[in-house]
Amino acid sequence: MAEYTRSISFYGREIDINIGLMAPQAGCGVWLTSGETSILVTATRQPGRPGVDFMPLLVDYEERLYAAGRIPGGYLRREGRPPERATLISRLIDRPIRPLFPEWLRDDVQVVATTLSVDDTVPPDVLCILGASLAIHGARIPFNGPVAAVRVGLVKDEFILNPTYAEIEAGDLDLVVAGCADGVIMVEAGANQLPEKDVVEAIEFGFEAIQELLKAQQQVLADLNITPVELPPPPKNEELIAFVEEQAQEGIRSILRQFLDKTSREQQLEELKAKLEAQIQERPEGDPLRLYLLENPKELDNQFKALLKKLMRQQILQEGVRVDGRKLDEVRPVSCRVGLIPRVHGSALFNRGLTQVLSITTLGTPGDAQELDDLHPVDEKRYMHHYNFPGFSVGETRPSRSPGRREIGHGALAERALVPVLPKEEEFPYVVRVVSEVLSSNGSTSMGSVCGSTLSLMDAGVPIKAPVSGVAMGLIKEGDEVRILTDIQGIEDFLGDMDFKVAGTRAGITALQMDMKITGITVDVVEQAIRQAKAGREFILDKMLETIAAPRPQLAKTAPRLLTFKVDPEDIGKIIGPGGKTVRGITEATGAKVDISDDGTITVSSSVGGQAEAARAMIENLVRRVEEGQVYLGKVTRIIPIGAFVEFLPGKEGMIHISQLAEYRVGRVEDEVAVEDEVVVKVRSIDHKGRINLTRLGISPEEAARVRNHHH
């Protein structure tokens, strides 16, 4: 492709587009630059592999630390496993483009976004979505685009388009909305308990701005003479369709109307499908349908699922009844328990229908904060939420592996939902980690994690500002007919058109995540879903608060105890000591852990009472300013003919002249004191060189006793 360049102005920012200069062997390489951020996005297509019955799309966001002028740490000094943020951006690019490919496309498609340079002001993720849309079209891959995305912030009650990191931090909203010609296709948001109406206005504001990016893309495609690539659907086997409908339609309808639980429903559906397979096998060997299924063994299952999807959706659209008998806006039964697990700092078991999540809270010290090594300006996290989804939660056997993209994404969503209600570091200096173990899954385990984690944090005594609950909303849409479902279960997610997760407090929303399986919905439908979700969230929240109404007033006995105080930043070196010798000595002597911040904030933690207080006393003694007239208990460190040296504070030593050892005349220093003797001394004077002169004279018996008692 010949090199093509174009610059577009978008709400005060210039976006430079270059197609054809880079990655000549990729299907298409799009180089985008905005400010000092530069991204290369490629799209490549290969013929599909035999037997694949799904669309194998792979989206990767590659962070390179050279983009910020940094060299990676570690022995190899090169990037390793993608950081969590890169995984989340990969998902953010994937989610708005996936629904726009024809569902029958079986070719391998890969989209790779590589950061070449980034500034430290604006996130690069929405630029990647623009590049992905252009690259897919440029690679002549069948795609119902273009698609674009924008970020919306809210600062001082005003919406801001593509806000800076500083504006996001200062504001009450961080929302990414993606859309195409047919409507909104993806929403991702974190908010500071924002009212529903404000969130809807933000989505509408962003969707209107997206139209400019869609028009700009259309102009680029017209300049390059790129027209949409049509991929007609594969021919249908009408005989198979008729056979499945004739033999299974009434059976499926009957199963759906029995309002069975998940296990019983799946068992009956499998038995019905097995009967169809048996009927096929009973046909003569030369029967055309039998021969077709021998060549296409997955087609019977595919057609059976298609009929199940059609009938389930009809039942919802025409009768307003769901597969488990619930109304469209009804939440499954909810039950909760807290404090189940001994020794942990907080625990909760949350049940909603057949979805069950166990959330465990652990409190740590400031040194336990997660250090981040990526291109984001934030370099550590005080709150971590980890989500695990084992095979047994859906009745499957599979090996346990490191967290995949889904686990990372669900954990990040639950984390985003809870961060706005966590106490400030000054009020609660603990680092908090919550792990959500999915023990049983039948829809919306991420929102189950939000609910379970709220309960677990309250059980741990974390003073959250308000409890958070979450619910997943679904959609069934046929033409103009729309039905929104509250608290979707697995089959409604799988056969429906939308998965819209909403989390928040009574005051407002803290997190949103909307994904579509169709090519977009109107803002009005989004608003309806958000409003219906509020009723569902509040129903769940009421059930949660019946279990525990407020955070426990005290932390668990097993939680570390923290003492936080300030010292002069100039004294940090004294506390650390050469090579860390002094602070290690404090830790070894007391058993407490010491964390030191650059601003002079000291956090001392211990699991045993008294250890933290002892460490604090040692640190305060280290940095205490010595003044004339102060009395200390010290230890004799060495003796010289004219006096004795005494260490009266860690690292601080003074000399008692022989004339100051006693009221009477002392002939030899050794006659009065010996090395290692404890002596009560008073600061007599400090000379211009900082040398400290001590005395044993002029100290009352009461004062000496007080100092000895305080020390011991």
From Swiss-Prot:
HAMAP family: PNPase. This is Polyribonucleotide nucleotidyltransferase. One of its GO terms (molecular function) is polyribonucleotide nucleotidyltransferase activity. The keyword Cytoplasm applies. It is found in: Cytoplasm. It comes from Synechococcus sp. (strain JA-2-3B'a(2-13)). Belongs to the polyribonucleotide nucleotidyltransferase family. Keywords: Cytoplasm, Magnesium, Metal-binding, Nucleotidyltransferase, RNA-binding, Transferase. Gene3D superfamilies: GHMP Kinase, N-terminal domain, K Homology domain, type 1, Nucleic acid-binding proteins. Pfam families: KH_1 (PF00013), PNPase (PF03726), RNase_PH (PF01138), RNase_PH_C (PF03725), S1 (PF00575). Involved in mRNA degradation. Catalyzes the phosphorolysis of single-stranded polyribonucleotides processively in the 3'- to 5'-direction. The lineage of its organism: Bacteria, Bacillati, Cyanobacteriota, Cyanophyceae, Synechococcales. It comes from the Bacteria.
